[in-house]
Amino acid sequence: MSRKSTYPKVMCTQHPDSASRYISTQEEPGEAIEAAVVFGCDEYMPDYEGKATPYHQNVQIVSRLIEETDLVPGKDVFITPRAPSAVQENRFRQLMVMMSIAEANHGALEYSDVQAINEFVHPMTGTVREILDAQQHMVDVSELAKKEFGFAMEVPRIIPLIEDAPALLHAKELTENTLLAWKERFGTVPEKFRVFLGKSDSALSFGHVASTLSCKYAINGLSELNFELETETGIVFGAGTLPFRGHLDLKNAENFFREYRGIGTITLQSALRYSHEKGDAEALVDLAKEKLPEIPELFSAEEKEELVNLIGIFGTRYSLIIRELASTINRLSDLLPQQRDRLMHRGSGGYSRSAPDISGIVSLCRTDIGKELLASMPAEDLHLPRAIKFTGALYSIGLPPEFIGTGAALNEAREKLGDEACERLLTKYFPSLVSDLNFATGYLDLNVASRFLSGACFKEVSKDIEILHETLGLETHPEPSYRILLEMMQPELLQAGTSGNCMDEEVSQLVCSTLTKMGKIRKALG
């Protein structure tokens, strides 16, 4: 990178992906202390996005850090809330979170001259206007705090979270245009500016391979900005432990840090802290502090063009299958446990994730590839569950989503882009792909999966697996205990998957218990 990063290295988050532990909002301030003192994280993200987090949680965390530790919030450990989107949820909730940021900073400045909260995350970002409007709200709240309480704080800076594949492909342009417009609106340009890239939602919409390539395309573009602009850009990369959501765990750490060179901060989510072996999370934190940031790999114009066409091909093949599975995924996801206090899925306080606008990908793809991608998209939004439960549902029927569309897309890429493009995919663009798929084979059971799929859908999935075995030499090595649980629960799971949740309470509890046990075996809910 062009400059030495001074950003935090490990952001502890409140993602509900632990299979072994439910954590209430009342426990989360203590969790923040644990993140810093036990796990060694240098950043914690109170999460208000689609979540019933009390507004005063920011204040509680900052106060407890001051009272119970020797750590100085804003210096030794950073508190970086994720505020709700004014577009996807509502502006009132966003403003209330911003007021709590001001209150937390007011309390911290009574103990020291260090401001506790200096940044906040804005989810599902798609436009410059969203970013600037949210930043303006923070400016307005800061001015109100100064007027009403007589204290001046440095206005916390927004971290846009980019979560879908089309936006990831335009992350560089979005960031550059934001910084140019920032100067016009606020009169200055920030010295530092972080961008948060999400692996999970882009995988949900476009599949594992297209998601990974989109994230790497975004990392490449944002790294280029570090050489082109005065502002120092930093990258937060959000990843879970299963491959579909990023494959960030201790065993895969070497692959992960090589794959995503250029990022400056990782997320340490709940599954790694509570569902993996004791000591794994601490070891990964130490490793991240040692390695981050690594020098990014920059792609040529020709390589970027090839990446986009690969994204289009893999996204198409994934989308054609996933839309056939939507109803099954939704029914099964309802049976997976809630591990955090979520808002309702739909309504004034919650939201559902809908299909992204793919014009940003189609316009970059080769014409024939773009047309096929466009045609593969469902006519109506599928309203799929959040990424963790989406992933967990597919793992729970013996069909890890990493496989969906991947084999057919690999063959199609070879036909349309050539053998050399496929070779570059496996050796340069996504060298960890084979490792990811080998991990997922431990939870693959086509016999079980067939009971949830239509005949045509099962034929396509079987073809994917066959191609991957032949092309990549994958070896299926099912986890014995996992397979037993899959087989044992089939009648009840099939009922849940095809007939709605019309089961008595005793059977429902048995199904939920077994799904949770499977999550514990794979060390993540999803």
Curated annotation (Swiss-Prot):
InterPro entries cross-referenced by the UniProt entry: PEP_COase_arc-type (IPR007566), Pyrv/PenolPyrv_kinase-like_dom (IPR015813)
> What keywords were assigned to this record?
Carbon dioxide fixation, Lyase, Magnesium
Instruction: Describe the reaction catalysed, as an equation.
Output: oxaloacetate + phosphate = phosphoenolpyruvate + hydrogencarbonate
What cofactor requirement does the entry state? Mg(2+)
- The Enzyme Commission number assigned here is 4.1.1.31
Q: Which GO terms describe its biological process?
A: carbon fixation; oxaloacetate metabolic process; tricarboxylic acid cycle
| GO molecular function list | magnesium ion binding; phosphoenolpyruvate carboxylase activity
User: Carries keyword Zinc-finger?
Assistant: no
Provide an example Pfam family for this protein: PEPcase_2
NCBIfam families associated with the record: PEPCase_arch
Q: What does this protein do?
A: Catalyzes the irreversible beta-carboxylation of phosphoenolpyruvate (PEP) to form oxaloacetate (OAA), a four-carbon dicarboxylic acid source for the tricarboxylic acid cycle.
Q: Quaternary state and partners of this protein?
A: Homotetramer.
* Membership in a protein family: Belongs to the PEPCase type 2 family.
HAMAP family reported for this sequence: PEPcase_type2
Protein's recorded name: Phosphoenolpyruvate carboxylase
Q: Which organism is it from?
A: Methanosarcina acetivorans (strain ATCC 35395 / DSM 2834 / JCM 12185 / C2A)
